A protein has these predicted regions:
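Acidic/histidine-rich catalytic neighborhood of metal-dependent amide-processing enzymes
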Residues: 73-146, 190, 344
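Short acidic loop-to-helix transition motifs that present clustered carboxylates
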Residues: 19-22, 109, 134, 287-290
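Metal-dependent amide/peptide-bond hydrolase catalytic core
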Residues: 139, 148-345
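Acidic-glycine-rich active-site phosphate/pyrophosphate-binding loop
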Residues: 45-61, 124, 139-150, 270, ...
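N-terminal helical capping/dimerization or prosegment-like subdomains
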Residues: 1-47, 215-219, 232-240, 322-327
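Active-site metal-coordination/substrate-binding segment of hydrolases
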Residues: 34-99
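Short helix-capping segments at alpha-helix termini
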Residues: 8, 90-94, 243-244, 275-276
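Hydrophobic/aromatic beta-strand patches that form the interior of the parallel beta-sheet core
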Residues: 13, 36-38, 101, 126-128, ...
Length: 345
């Protein structure tokens, strides 16, 4: 990525903040007055399972590119760079700067965007997060909060369980309360983003079969709305569970949202319709993303728009239609021209 972007004459920052963890930030034009930011993440998830084609082969078959990260989101990153290349190759004057942000560790702990926040100030009029949306215009996504919930007991020999306190039994009661709370959360709705949700994802407890467990831990995630964060959900959970469990924040990724009639949505709809010939679909991104680093952290109106289907992300036989990638390039070119290229005189 660095080599490609430097080859376009862009001012490139290569930030290897950890071994094999790299952010690439590239600028064309005035970096203090940016018209549009185009974002992608460079990392992918693991490749367990039996694949039709080798997962890192990038096999082209049936008009699709197959492989891990093809949809999430190597195709989006490639389309961003191809679009910037096309715009700069045209030689038109820029009225505002263009910024490309490619980060590491989105799939894990968001270290790349956290590093970006620490090291880089960005002021811009618009941002496109090139996550896989099937070229639909996504105005935002719910936030992602997660927690460790821990119960404590007293270990003893399992032949006399009443001599101790079984932390797994305590956790079983906690989980029943969480199931009821999760049902309650589905009644909390946002017109654009749907309902809140809560799910128990993992459980660990006990060290030996013949020992009453003194400790049990689960991991819980909740999807939340703009203006909410992990501390608020933590407080609700702790009040619900009282002394039965300890609630510790694991992660906190804020929601991102722009109005459906905002300028960036209207502009994206026009560009998608122009390129594809179809009426653009406007909806929400069903998963989580790092869009809030730009919309909330930098105050930039931000949408999600990219090739590929999020429904195939993280799955065996992930793939993306080549036509969607080609259309994405043209859509990004159109967006860049509207936000950053000077009009012909």
């Amino acid at each position: 990525c660095e080599e490609v972007l430097r080859g376009l004459g862009m001012d490139v920052q290569f930030d290897e903040f950890e071994p094999n963890r790299v952010n690439v930030i590239a600028y064309a034009g005035n970096r203090d007055d940016i018209g549009i930011v185009l974002y992608g993440h460079l990392d992918v998830v693991s490749t367990a399972g039996k694949w039709k084609y080798p997962p890192f082969s990038g096999e082209l078959a049936d008009g699709e590119i197959w492989g891990r990260g093809s949809a999430d989101m190597k195709s989006g990153c490639a389309a961003v760079m191809a679009a910037v290349k096309a715009v700069l190759a045209a030689g038109q004057a820029l009225k505002k700067g263009i910024c490309v942000v490619l980060v590491a560790d989105e799939e894990n702990k968001n270290k790349g965007c956290n590093r970006l926040k620490e090291t880089t100030q960005i002021k811009a009029d618009a941002c496109i997060v090139a996550e896989p949306t099937k070229l639909q215009v996504h105005y935002g996504n719910r936030g992602y909060t997660s927690f460790f919930l821990r119960t404590f007991g007293e270990a003893c020999h399992a032949s006399n369980p009443k001599a101790g306190k079984n932390a797994i039994y305590v956790m079983a009661r906690v989980i029943q309360k969480l199931e009821a709370f999760a049902e309650e959360l589905t009644g909390r709705k946002n017109r654009q983003l749907g309902c809140m949700s809560l799910s128990v994802g993992t459980i660990r407890g006990g060290v030996n079969l013949n020992t009453v467990p003194a400790f049990c831990e689960i991991e819980v995630e909740a999807r939340v709305f703009p203006g909410m964060d992990a501390s608020g959900i933590q407080k609700e959970l702790q009040e619900l569970l009282g002394d039965e469990a300890e609630v510790v924040i694991r992660s906190n990724l804020l929601a991102s949202l722009v109005p459906e009639d905002s300028e960036i949505v209207r502009t994206a709809v026009a560009c998608v319709s122009e390129i594809t010939g179809d009426e653009a679909v406007i909806t929400r991104f069903p998963a989580c993303s790092e869009a809030s680093y730009f919309s909330v952290g930098y105050g930039i109106p931000t949408i999600l728009l990219g090739p590929g289907d999020i429904g195939l992300a993280h799955k065996i036989d992930e793939r993306v239609p080549v036509k969607q990638i080609e259309d994405a390039v043209d859509i990004y070119v159109s967006m860049i021209r509207r936000y950053a290229v000077a009009e012909d005189v």
